[in-house]
A protein has these predicted regions:
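Gly/Gly-Pro- and Ser/Thr-rich, intrinsically disordered tail segments characteristic of DNA damage-repair
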Residues: 1-227, 233, 237-240, 278, ...
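DNA-contacting surface of Y-family translesion DNA polymerases
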Residues: 8, 183, 191-336, 411
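Short, charged/polar surface micro-motifs in flexible loops or helix N-caps
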Residues: 14, 37-40, 297-300, 346-349
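Short small-residue beta-strand/loop micro-motif enriched in glycine and branched aliphatics
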Residues: 73-74, 300-304, 351-352
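Short Gly/Ser/Thr- and Asp/Glu-enriched loop/turn motifs at secondary-structure junctions
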Residues: 103-107, 146-149, 285-289, 334-338
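Short, hydrophobic beta-strand segments
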Residues: 108-114, 303-306, 353-359
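C-terminal hydrophobic structural anchor segments
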Residues: 323-380
Length: 417
């Protein structure tokens, strides 16, 4: 098989760029697109480059961001608007290839191997895409041009904003080896710290470490890290359409106070699971995987996930699975500051269900009917018109409206372990 031609396109400061396009008076200013601006749990989802230069970062609580940048303009997130622009960007991609794999709303891989005969070299195609998105939508993109998905993403991260980086087998070591190990896809903060404890700080050092040694440190994931660091990745670009592009629905929050007990965590997981389940029902979807994200008060975090026997969009079922994942993986070494829930591997709500001798599908159907009735009441009378009793056990935590606050995070926000 010949060399593939893969692009990774990353819309720069996407949410902020969309807001500046819709509101020209914001251009050139320090802005942060955030969750609920009125509460401490509101966080920065995306910041403009002027704000970033002042130290404002994704995932930072609003109050902390304002300490870094006194003139920071807070803009509430508008998810529907970002979905619309994401669709516009995808239309440009589709003019060059039908092999487009979304990675969140603001990133995508394109396999243009079969397109070079029609449109010219990979670099020419990248330049055309960049110019069109800037001209037609007013948004800049950074593009990595390479021979697989992992290295293409490294390329898009290399020059921001509005850059194009070419990584080929011939210049791979020169460009990639000096980069921090944390720049590699799926190397989050916890993995980077563990690598650092073994004296590995760059991708080059990781590539030169024996794969069996890495397996001893990280299990089978060690083999993957070794391959990725050496530029080895045969993962195909997953062909998608409008109905398959959304693969997961997640919601997380930086809490109004530290979480210190299982009861605190259960309350938060109920709130977040309700939001995730409602959004899946809005999409006509169910999830086959439940994932949790946990971050302590020193900002160290991890994710854990569980594959389900049957897909679900039942709020309380997702909450119970998430809580069991938490209990099995956290023993309270520190208080928690952030927590999240994600439903992944989505399928249509009417997808086939595997029945067994001990199936609880009848009970699940009853819970689905209850959830739908609650959805109807909340749509008519407001989100707080119907609440679970646990919400009233803590007015501070229970005051979070996870669904309307729409704490929507870029994909990378969950990749911490």
């Amino acid at each position: 098989m010949g060399q593939r031609h893969i692009l990774h396109c990353d819309c720069n400061c996407f949410y902020a760029s969309v807001e500046m396009q819709e509101h020209p008076e914001l251009r050139g200013k320090s802005i942060a697109v955030c969750g609920d601006p009125e509460a401490r749990h509101g966080i920065v989802l995306t910041a403009s480059y002027p704000a970033k230069r002042m130290g404002v970062k994704t995932g930072m609580p609003i109050w902390e961001a304002k300490q870094h940048c006194r003139d920071l303009i807070i803009v509430p997130a508008s998810y529907g608007k970002y979905q619309k622009y994401s669709g516009y960007v995808r239309e440009v991609f589709n003019d060059y290839t039908d092999q487009v794999e979304s990675f969140g709303l603001d990133e995508a891989w394109l396999d243009i191997t079969g397109s070079v005969g029609l449109f010219g070299s990979p670099v020419k195609i990248a330049k055309e895409i960049s110019a069109r998105i800037k001209r037609e939508l007013g948004i800049t993109v950074s593009i990595g041009v390479s021979f697989n998905k992992i290295t293409a993403k490294l390329g898009s991260d290399y020059k921001k904003p509005d850059g194009i980086t070419i990584i080929e087998p011939e210049n791979y070591k020169e460009i990639v080896y000096p980069l921090p190990a944390g720049d590699l896809l799926y190397v989050g903060a916890a993995t980077q710290r563990k690598l650092g404890s073994y004296g590995i700080s760059t991708i080059g050092q990781l590539a030169e470490t024996n794969s069996e040694t890495l397996k001893g440190w990280f299990g089978v994931m060690g083999y993957t890290l070794s391959a990725f660091a050496r530029g080895l990745d045969q993962t195909p670009v997953a062909k998608q359409n409008a109905h398959t592009a959304i693969k997961s629905v997640g919601n997380s929050a930086t809490t109004p106070r530290d979480l210190t007990t299982d009861e605190d965590v259960w309350l938060m997981l109920v709130l977040l699971s309700e939001s995730v389940a409602m959004r899946m029902r809005d999409l006509g979807s169910k999830c086959n995987v439940v994932e949790i994200y946990v971050r302590d008060n020193e900002l160290s975090g991890f994710t854990r996930r569980r594959k389900l026997d049957n897909p679900t969009n039942v709020s309380i079922e997702i909450a119970r699975i998430a809580f069991d994942l938490f209990k099995r993986n956290y023993s309270w070494p520190k208080p928690l500051r952030g927590i999240g829930v994600r439903g992944a591997d989505l399928c249509p709500a009417d997808c086939a269900v595997q029945l067994g001798f001990f199936s609880n599908e009848e009970k699940r159907e009853k819970l689905e009917h209850i959830d739908k009735a609650v959805d109807t009441l909340r749509q008519r009378y407001g989100y707080r018109s119907v609440q679970r009793a646990v919400v009233y056990t803590d007015p501070v935590l229970g005051g979070i409206n996870a669904y309307d606050d729409h704490n929507i995070h870029p994909v990378g926000y969950f990749h911490t372990a």
